[in-house]
């Protein structure tokens, strides 16, 4: 079954009863860069499946996207609160940028996320590199993302959708301050078997972060099953495999598999564009 962008807005409002919709990811959907003309900026869409898949959704629903401001001119394109409206040709939602330092990028992103989490989840623990400073910075940056989310939903009902392995702890920090919010998380890479994930010294803490969500999503049923087994054995959660739930400290997280889609019309247009054979 497919659904058009024009149908998404009414469907969301029907099921979420007017809650503000907030997407949270490491990668931003639009970057500002300085052009060759002095003082002028260009806007580009970074390559990547996550932003390509979610940008049409956000344009249909509106709301807020919280992400790392990675473009060289990003700071010059936002208001004092770090916000800008996107896309530039038809502003439909607000992008709230989170700023990362040089150490943040090298320890949270290139370090813990990409040198540890990525190979571990792809069944290559032999390629992992772990440093105490990587983990500490990962925690710190996840808390910074959580603080940005909390600022944007202060005094509001909201549905928050976290993305991927960069932000495994952020739901825990948000839940601690706002237990009333609806939290979901989609994991865009494989989730490994327990025998692999337990090799992480921080496995229990990472799982607690993910279990703070109301809904945890994966691409495949096997990834969801791996997560449930890890939740039971490594985090001490009470797991119901038939219902696909994991309960920890009185909070129940539902776990499912939701293969992500693509913008079919966009791919058809690209395939028939001049110069494509």
For the regions a language model picked out, list residue spans one by one.
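Catalytic cores of carbohydrate-active enzymes across secretory and cytosolic contexts
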Residues: 1-277
